[in-house]
């Protein structure tokens, strides 16, 4: 069975798929990457049995194109800011830092990667809160990962840690599900977004082969008690 899944699910799906394979006997060949890029590959003819996206929009498009019948929300996440571990970036108010043009802000690539789309939503929130500041941040933020032309992140490295270590940004806006793993990286610090900018995002999956029993079993496992516990243990958030 083949699974296409958002790259932000790799940490959580690695133990989840191992548990599923042990319990069910079904083997899963997983491909991880930017959800928008994976959705385009499906539209162009590739056919995994299951698609798990970091948003609802990409699987909804596949439903609209009759590649799938329904979208199932299965977990949630939120954004955070990872900063270089220096007092100038760890001590001041994060909202102040985001509005300070001296700091370079990195994101993932909008459209190709939902994380980049969520960063754009954050800029929208900031613009409503402080008119002019959201548009200014949007204009100077740089998409550093997740796009077709983005430089690859070395194996075993997290994008936020690598990009900050390579001095490509001072602040990186990405998923909070990486926070525990990033906490082990001394050169960076994870900071939660201020309440006025914080929001949760919903991940959705769809079956692309409704008649494939193993795929049905995988979806049931992800949505079931054991799958949900693994997702939450690995930093994802429960559906509310």
Residue positions per predicted region:
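Central helical "cap/lid" subdomain
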Residues: 66-72
């Amino acid at each position: 069975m083949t699974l296409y899944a958002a790259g932000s699910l790799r940490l959580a799906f690695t133990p989840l798929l191992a548990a599923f394979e042990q319990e069910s006997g079904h083997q899963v060949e997983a491909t991880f990457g930017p959800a928008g890029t994976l959705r385009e590959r499906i539209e162009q003819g590739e056919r995994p049995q299951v698609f798990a996206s970091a948003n609802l929009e990409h699987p909804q498009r596949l439903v609209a194109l009759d590649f799938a019948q329904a979208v199932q929300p299965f977990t949630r996440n939120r954004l955070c800011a990872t900063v270089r571990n220096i007092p100038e970036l760890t001590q001041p108010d994060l909202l102040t830092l985001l509005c300070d043009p001296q700091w370079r802000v990195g994101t993932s690539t909008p459209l190709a990667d939902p994380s980049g789309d969520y960063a754009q939503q954050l800029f929208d929130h900031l613009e409503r809160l402080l008119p002019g500041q959201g548009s200014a941040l949007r204009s100077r933020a740089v998409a550093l990962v997740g796009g077709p032309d983005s430089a690859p992140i070395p194996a075993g490295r997290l994008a936020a840690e690598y990009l900050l270590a390579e001095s490509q940004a001072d602040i990186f806006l990405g998923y909070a599900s990486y926070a525990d793993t990033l906490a082990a990286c001394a050169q960076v610090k994870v900071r939660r977004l201020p309440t006025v900018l914080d929001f949760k995002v919903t991940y959705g999956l769809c079956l692309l082969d409704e008649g494939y029993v193993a795929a049905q079993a995988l979806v049931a496992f992800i949505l079931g008690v054991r799958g949900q516990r693994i997702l939450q243990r690995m930093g994802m958030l429960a559906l509310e």
